[in-house]
């Protein structure tokens, strides 16, 4: 039984790709069900990836972030994920912040309670792609542990 998931620098973006140098979204992957090419159970049911209608956001949350592929409303819900809490985090020292907000946006839209944190916004800055090797890795794990204690019974 999975109660929660912690995702640091989530792979992505969902449904497509991003040119991180140009900070632009790439074309939709016609085989993607959302996060992967593996089939998901949605409510309303989808028989193929093309049944999951998506559109690019009009505007990103911040400068330097790409727009995300999101479902056309009303969004299909991920039925098997509805009782799982997700913590997703990004850091400023890598190329990931360009698209890291996209997966949490998709999950929340699909009915999965997902908290997204940019570590620099909570005073934990200067990390690279390998957070567990940074001098402030203890601060990172304390933050994540605090989230788990607060959000997982």
Q: Where are the predicted features?
A:
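Hydrophobic/aromatic beta-strand patches that form the interior of the parallel beta-sheet core
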Residues: 6, 87-90, 115-117
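Active-site nucleophile loop of the alpha/beta-hydrolase fold
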Residues: 6-15
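Structured segments of extracytoplasmic/periplasmic soluble domains
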Residues: 8, 106, 147-151
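Acidic beta-to-alpha connecting loop that harbors the catalytic carboxylate
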Residues: 91-95, 121, 128
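Catalytic histidine neighborhood in serine/cysteine hydrolases
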Residues: 108-126
């Amino acid at each position: 039984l999975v109660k929660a998931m912690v995702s640091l620098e989530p792979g992505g973006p969902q449904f497509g790709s991003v040119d991180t140098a140009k900070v632009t979204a790439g074309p939709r992957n016609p085989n993607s069900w959302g996060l992967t090419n593996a089939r998901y159970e949605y409510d309303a049911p989808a028989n193929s990836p093309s049944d999951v209608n998506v559109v690019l956001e009009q505007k990103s949350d911040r400068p330097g972030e790409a727009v995300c592929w999101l479902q056309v409303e009303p969004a299909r819900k991920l039925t098997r994920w509805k009782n799982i809490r997700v913590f997703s985090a990004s850091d400023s020292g890598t190329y990931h912040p360009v698209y890291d907000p996209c997966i949490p946006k998709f999950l929340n839209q699909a009915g999965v309670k997902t908290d997204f944190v940019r570590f620099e916004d909570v005073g934990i800055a200067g990390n690279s792609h390998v957070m567990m090797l940074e001098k402030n890795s203890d601060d990172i794990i304390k933050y994540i542990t605090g989230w788990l204690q607060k959000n997982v019974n």
